[in-house]
């Protein structure tokens, strides 16, 4: 049996290929960035061909580093930036336009138009999602309506759509047109109950069914690679990036949750085999589906600005020289000195969804110094995470016992301790922190017998560090009450 599993981790700014062993340990990794294209304010594009080129390069580089070949890989999994939309020619494989990235907001007018009849939650019952520029359906529509002749060609079956997972699979396998249910659940076109494209949604968004990939599970052998460097290796797992992190953290039981701390935060909670509708600002989404087993669902809460706030005080404020300095500066004081920083630079995401909120620093006095500001910056991430956890608990009627964490900010011990304190829950950092790629590797490995089952995966997952609450309940409530007061000051600024 081959000794390793490969994972393609295609993100918003870069592409990586990581090789894992049976223990889930990293054997080799290669990474390359790709260009961010900004044709107009609010428009964000990627060159899909460049992403495919970078994917080929990192696969070859990671294998070469350890003198590995295709025969050393039992399977390859794919994880990807979700919602980003590629439309290409069925015969040539050439994209008809750049990929429209999940951050792209050019479809805002179309969102408003659709929301006139039924509001932002018009399709939430079928999809678990509010109307937003975020999701794929309106991005597909924009390409169909703005690139000459593409709509007619799509209706004739000559044009294909896929998110990045589908485009990579198409190229890796010589033409397989598939997507998994986690990615499909972010298009605004899949029905959460049937796990299939919904005719009512296709009609509302004016998307031809002929251009859509077939929806499959997150863990099965889709086909074998035809790319020379990995020829013959089964492609056997696909998960959207945040769902992949949930799998990588082995959150396989209802009520288990992970939070990814990056530029923003993405918190997903496993809610079991039935979709849980949200009345508290969460998204309902597919967590994963392994082979023929029932789909498992999740609630998702996203926070727009967390790590980006540290970057902002570094670059715009000059408070620190490098991002890691924020913890050192924050440790120069024993608390936040009554200062609260609400980073609503472009509004607030979950659970508020207020586009007209703007950033606020509250509680300033002459006593305030740089250390207090640094504390307030870090604590903002923890406070926002608590708000999302509380909303999820209300929606799911499940109490979170432990929060598993990953992402760049989890190296900040001060933040992780404060997160545990303000949640009044243990916070855990895993030994392998590349959880997104690990989740894709787990999904692929399950499909080919490299891993036996989810119990096997849980036995391989291990803890690097656990933080436990140390704060008095009265102090916890006092801090959170002032945070809630500061948040209200950011509302309705515009």
Swiss-Prot record:
Inhibited by fructose 1,6-bisphosphate (FBP). Glycerol binds at residues 82-83, 134, 241-242. Gene3D superfamilies: 3.30.420.40. Pfam families: FGGY_C, FGGY_N. The keyword Magnesium does not apply. ADP binds at residues 12, 16, 263, 307, 408, 412. This is Glycerol kinase. The gene is glpK.
């Amino acid at each position: 049996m081959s000794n390793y599993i490969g994972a393609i981790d295609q993100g918003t700014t870069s592409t990586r290929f990581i090789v894992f062993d049976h223990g889930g340990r990293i054997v080799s990794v290669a990474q390359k960035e790709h260009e961010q294209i900004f044709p107009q304010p609010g428009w964000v594009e990627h060159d899909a061909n460049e992403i495919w080129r970078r994917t080929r390069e990192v696969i070859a580089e990671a294998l070469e580093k350890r003198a590995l070949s295709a025969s050393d890989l039992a399977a390859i999994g794919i994880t990807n930036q979700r919602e980003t939309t590629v439309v290409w020619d069925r015969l040539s494989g050439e994209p008809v336009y750049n990929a429209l990235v999940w951050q792209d907001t050019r479809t805002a007018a179309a969102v408003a138009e659709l929301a006139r009849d039924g509001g932002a939650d018009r399709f939430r019952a079928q999809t678990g999602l509010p109307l937003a520029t975020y999701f794929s359906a309106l991005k597909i529509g924009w390409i169909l309506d703005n690139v000459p002749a593409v709509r007619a060609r799509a209706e004739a079956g000559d044009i294909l759509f896929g998110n990045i997972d589908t485009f990579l699979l198409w190229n890796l396998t010589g033409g397989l047109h598939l997507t998994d249910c986690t990615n499909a659940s972010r298009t605004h076109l899949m029905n959460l109950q049937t796990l299939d494209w919904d005719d009512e949604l296709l009609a509302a968004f004016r998307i031809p069914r002929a251009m859509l990939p077939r929806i499959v599970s997150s863990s099965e052998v889709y086909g074998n690679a035809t790319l020379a460097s990995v020829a013959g290796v089964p492609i056997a797992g696909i998960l959207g990036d945040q769902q992949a992190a949930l799998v990588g953290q082995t959150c396989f039981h209802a009520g288990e949750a992970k939070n990814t701390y990056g530029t923003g935060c993405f918190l997903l909670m496993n809610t079991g085999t039935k979709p849980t509708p949200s009345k508290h600002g969460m998204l309902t989404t597919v967590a994963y589906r392994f082979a023929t087993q029932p789909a498992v669902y999740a609630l998702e809460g996203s926070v727009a600005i967390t790590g980006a706030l540290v970057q902002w005080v570094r670059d715009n404020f000059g408070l620190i020289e490098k991002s890691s300095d924020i913890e050192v500066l924050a440790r120069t004081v024993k608390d936040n000195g009554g200062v609260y920083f609400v980073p609503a630079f472009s509004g607030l995401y979950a659970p508020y969804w207020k586009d007209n909120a703007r950033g606020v620093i509250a509680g300033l006095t002459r006593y305030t110094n740089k250390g207090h500001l640094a504390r307030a910056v870090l604590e903002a991430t923890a406070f926002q995470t608590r708000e999302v956890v509380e909303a999820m608990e209300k929606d799911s009627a499940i109490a979170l016992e432990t929060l598993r964490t990953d992402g760049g900010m989890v190296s900040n011990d001060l933040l992780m301790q404060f997160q545990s304190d303000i949640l009044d829950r243990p916070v855990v950092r895993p030994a392998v922190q590349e959880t997104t790629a690990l989740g894709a590797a787990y999904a692929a490995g399950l499909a080919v017998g490299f891993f036996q089952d989810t119990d096997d995966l849980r036995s391989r997952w291990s803890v690097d560090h656990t933080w436990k609450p140390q704060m008095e309940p009265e102090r916890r409530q006092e801090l959170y009450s002032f945070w809630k007061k500061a948040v209200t000051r950011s509302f309705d600024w515009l």
